[in-house]
């Protein structure tokens, strides 16, 4: 049995975060390996681990680190496989590590998840593997239904504890949870790119430009889940066979949250600097609750979103893999 995921820790103290990821991989039956290597103190060891892991067939890397958290970025600089970054709360509430993971230069993206969210890193890794492995995708769908059931149980506990005289609960009929895993079609685009508004189009066009140059088919639709919720859901149903989503949004960044709530495909988030220099959308995208990860890139970095999409798709597509290798080796310059 060979590992499909490599987990690298910046220090042994990060193991408590890795345990969350390992529990998910055990449940999903995805083989993994784990090593401890510092980007600053054992630079050559990191490079050696990444190189050997790629040769051994590892499909996804997870870098877990706190403080300056350069480990995920260093992994990305040395591989064409997708890298997920988990910032760890050591100081400053983990914000230092969060910025270090997400704000990577082109073309070295890190799909950053929330602070200490090892479980979301594992789920995102499984979603990426599920692009070309229907069995893994089905198990991820089952896992997500388990999170739904957990919320239902928590609600029952809360409601059963209410003793107020004026508590008047309504009867709410809940819709069934979808369990259909759609079949792929050759006619469907690989990627759906969803800007939340026309003000996000400049970044969206940069994203699609790189997708086109890497030969990745896509659909582009400007639609807001806040202004047009029903239309948004209909569009997601139409795009059920895409392999991944890229959501581009500023402000509270509801687009990414809405997409990941309605699809089990990987979601890449691109925060836009409409207000607060993009801090609001960056934090809203990254810090998702357990079970619904968004792999977030740097503020306004549509190019890195496209590169990350290519890294994910390249696991199962040799042509895309070849193109992303050339880009990351700097033999091709856009």
Swiss-Prot record:
Judged by the first EC level, this protein's enzyme class is isomerase
Record key words, sorted: Isomerase, Purine biosynthesis
* Amino-acid positions noted as binding substrate in the UniProt annotation, renumbered to this chain: 11, 14, 41
Give the signal peptide range. none
Q: Report which reactions are catalysed by this protein.
A: 5-carboxyamino-1-(5-phospho-D-ribosyl)imidazole + H(+) = 5-amino-1-(5-phospho-D-ribosyl)imidazole-4-carboxylate
**Which cysteines form disulfides?**
none
What Gene Ontology molecular-function terms does this entry list?
5-(carboxyamino)imidazole ribonucleotide mutase activity
E.C. designation(s): 5.4.99.18
Which Gene3D superfamilies does this entry report, sorted A to Z?
3.40.50.1970
Which PANTHER family would you find in this protein's record?
PHOSPHORIBOSYLAMINOIMIDAZOLE CARBOXYLASE (PTHR23046:SF2), PHOSPHORIBOSYLAMINOIMIDAZOLE CARBOXYLASE CATALYTIC SUBUNIT (PTHR23046)
Q: What is this protein called?
A: Probable N5-carboxyaminoimidazole ribonucleotide mutase
